[in-house]
């Protein structure tokens, strides 16, 4: 026997690292099996972490003492909060990362985890004791264990496409996981093929930057991790350019070489991250598509052109790239490609990401039909915790839709399945006013402490912050003004005779804690970090009761019958994607509509309201 562990994690990507670290934090003796230690923490596609919906997941991973947030802070070279002009519930923290720094930081984190061994080799099969998992085959030897987490990414029988050329690989230059794909197939699991793509990597020294629009980060970078005090890396700019009609002409002329349009690829790609070929075909009337030129590091010339992933032949890639402003003389360091890979229907899984028919086998990341580092990391954390719980004879660890975005994601996956790579959006969450990025620690760290997956440093910081928040809330609750007093201080309130606490007043438009400090100087004792949280809590307090009432009404309507002749095309507020699916499937009830892939809680609420109005006027 090569070794005996409680948990063996297969794969050293974003899901695997979180799974291995989470398992070990819960006290399980854990092994991480990867083809090469040097590839742990690699960013296979874009050099960025976070974004809309995704940034929420990173904060939740961090709140449960995961790695991604801290590593992104250590490697971040441009930080921006997306949707800053909108409400706090839909703001998304995002960071460009230096690939080398990210990989190095993740490897350092993995090496520092107590109870975690890294084993280089290829996992080729699974061992069983009856129907239960008993180990993993690594080469000709066995790692005995009580639970296994598979985080195979795009390696599961991966096939790279560049034009008409095909190469069996899990990532460019790395071997695929052929044997494990066959092993899963032998279990009789429902499986399919998906695909994703990546653009060419460009030499920044050959780009005419003077012609491009500059995109800077936030003046004051906002970290992902609740443990990070400040961002210390030098910050860089990104740049924006666009495709041109000439670009589109070159692509159209060569579509027959694209593996998607030639029929060489059968797997579905991510709807919200289409290739440039798909964009040109699907949006034929568009004369330009935006491209973000993102530096891949502080000391390398490599540029990632976000927005033009492609699998066209190398010569065609060179032609269309040089029709783009600023890229007329661009040199290509690595050509773009598409990759097709196996996935397991996530409806095979429990809420703890355990395969229902194979006790002790857990899956996380792209093997479950998702796309994105953040989605993978969040699943890895949950799978790792549950694998450790399984090995220790503990109850499953789950999070529901009202607790976390990671709960929303897993619930979507295991109940709806996927037909295309799943990506997290804020619109998928019914409770997004509660599930904000800013309060992830307040929602999850306490539960993590009870579970035993939170380290001492985070526990102490969380306790101190919670005490400060409670103290600030108590202080605000103890101060109040009558309408007359409020008016005297320049605050606009209803003349209803009701006294309002300082917390109530914070919910008023244009009222901040700084405004109230001019009335009550004692509020100056509230630290700025706590003040920001309190202001957001106060802003949303009045809406949360309304949201809870809306959700209760929505649940009552789940059994509502939908007319067979309902005109979805004329319904305002629905995306074209949802209109198309409703029209094609024609669900009989609101409940059935809710199970359609891609359906959102907001769309269901609109649908229910439309049917109720129609019934009222019948």
UniProtKB/Swiss-Prot annotation:
One of its GO terms (molecular function) is flavin adenine dinucleotide binding. Its cofactor is FAD. The keyword Flavoprotein applies. Keywords: Cytoplasm, FAD, Flavoprotein, NAD, tRNA processing. The keyword Transferase does not apply. PROSITE patterns: GIDA_1 (PS01280), GIDA_2 (PS01281). FAD binds at residues 11-16. Its main location: cytoplasm. GO terms for cellular component: cytosol. NAD(+) binds at residues 269-283. It is found in: Cytoplasm. One of its GO terms (biological process) is tRNA wobble uridine modification. It comes from the Bacteria. InterPro entries: FAD/NAD-bd_sf (IPR036188), GIDA_C_N (IPR049312), MnmG (IPR004416), MnmG-rel (IPR002218), MnmG-rel_CS (IPR020595), MnmG_C (IPR026904), MnmG_C_subdom (IPR047001), MnmG_C_subdom_sf (IPR044920). NAD-binding protein involved in the addition of a carboxymethylaminomethyl (cmnm) group at the wobble position (U34) of certain tRNAs, forming tRNA-cmnm(5)s(2)U34. HAMAP family: MnmG_GidA. Homodimer. Heterotetramer of two MnmE and two MnmG subunits. Belongs to the MnmG family. This is tRNA uridine 5-carboxymethylaminomethyl modification enzyme MnmG.
